[in-house]
Amino acid sequence: NILQFRKMIQCANKGSRAAWHYLDYGCYCGPGGRGTPVDELDRCCKIHDDCYIEAGKDGCYPKLTWYSWDCTGDAPTCNPKSKCKDFVCACDAAAAKCFAKAPYNKANWNIDTKTRCK
């Protein structure tokens, strides 16, 4: 679920960067996505997009699926409930952890995707 994902990001990065900073970053962070990721953070977003696609193949609706999770320290932890919820939660938790580890390059925010994402 998009709202829960936002909170997971805040958990993993200890509130150092707001979730909206990732909405228009690189070629894959935010709606859509194409081309070659511009950096490590953008690769995190592509992996997350691909994970959501896989979840959708199983009949899940990742952007709308509510799941159970906890923030333990700086690690989002999923609480098992069902296959669909667990899958989506795992997608979001992995992405949030990836975001927290990847450098944020301000030059890759709000880029011209038509020219840079081929």
From Swiss-Prot:
Record's catalysed reaction(s): a 1,2-diacyl-sn-glycero-3-phosphocholine + H2O = a 1-acyl-sn-glycero-3-phosphocholine + a fatty acid + H(+)
Residue positions binding Ca(2+): Y28, G30, G32, D49
Disulphide bridges: C11-C71, C27-C117, C29-C45, C44-C98, C51-C91, C60-C84, C78-C89
Gene Ontology molecular functions: calcium ion binding; calcium-dependent phospholipase A2 activity; phospholipid binding
GO (cellular component) term, any one: extracellular region
Subcellular compartments: Secreted
Active site residues per record: H48, D92
Tissues/organs with expression: Expressed by the venom gland.
The enzyme's E.C. designation: 3.1.1.4
Note on cofactor: Binds 1 Ca(2+) ion.
Cofactor(s) the protein needs: Ca(2+)
Record-linked InterPro entries: PLipase_A2 (IPR001211), PLipase_A2_Asp_AS (IPR033112), PLipase_A2_dom (IPR016090), PLipase_A2_dom_sf (IPR036444), PLipase_A2_His_AS (IPR033113)
EC class name: hydrolase
CDD domains listed in its UniProt record: PLA2c
Keywords in alphabetical order: Calcium, Disulfide bond, Hydrolase, Lipid degradation, Lipid metabolism, Metal-binding, Secreted
A biological-process GO annotation: lipid catabolic process
Stored SUPFAM superfamilies: Phospholipase A2, PLA2
Family (UniProt): Belongs to the phospholipase A2 family. Group I subfamily. D49 sub-subfamily.
Protein task: PLA2 catalyzes the calcium-dependent hydrolysis of the 2-acyl groups in 3-sn-phosphoglycerides.
UniProt-recorded name of the protein: Basic phospholipase A2 PA-13
Organism from which the protein derives: Pseudechis australis (Mulga snake)
